[in-house]
Amino acid sequence: MAVYAIGDIQGCWREFKALLKKLRLKDSDELWLAGDLINRGPDSLKVLRKLRAMDQQVHIVLGNHDLHFLAIVFGGHNAGAKDTFAELLGADDVEDLANWLRKQKLLHRNYGHVMTHAGLPGC
């Protein structure tokens, strides 16, 4: 079993897909994702759909871009001029994806390691 930690995919589907191909994940491998899965890049929708399909193999902590998206969907916030959520917000499955995303953690701990998107006090 291998554990791979990746941060800040930021909607870059093509690059993420290429990385997954290089990793050649086995069923027993784990993918730890340190937040900012979406926004900035052009393909946030593809990234979220892929990660949701890999749900049993990935451990995700939310980053500020992910939380910003959830605030737009559930909290009445507006997307900013630089946000690249348009395709995602218009998707038929946006609520399902947002509900799945909001169940992810802010911190993941396993194998004697802790993963967050940002730092921890005292570290």
Predicted regions and their residues:
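Active-site neighborhood of divalent metal-dependent phosphoester bond hydrolases
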Residues: 45-123
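N-terminal active-site segment of His-dependent metallophosphoesterases
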Residues: 1-50, 54
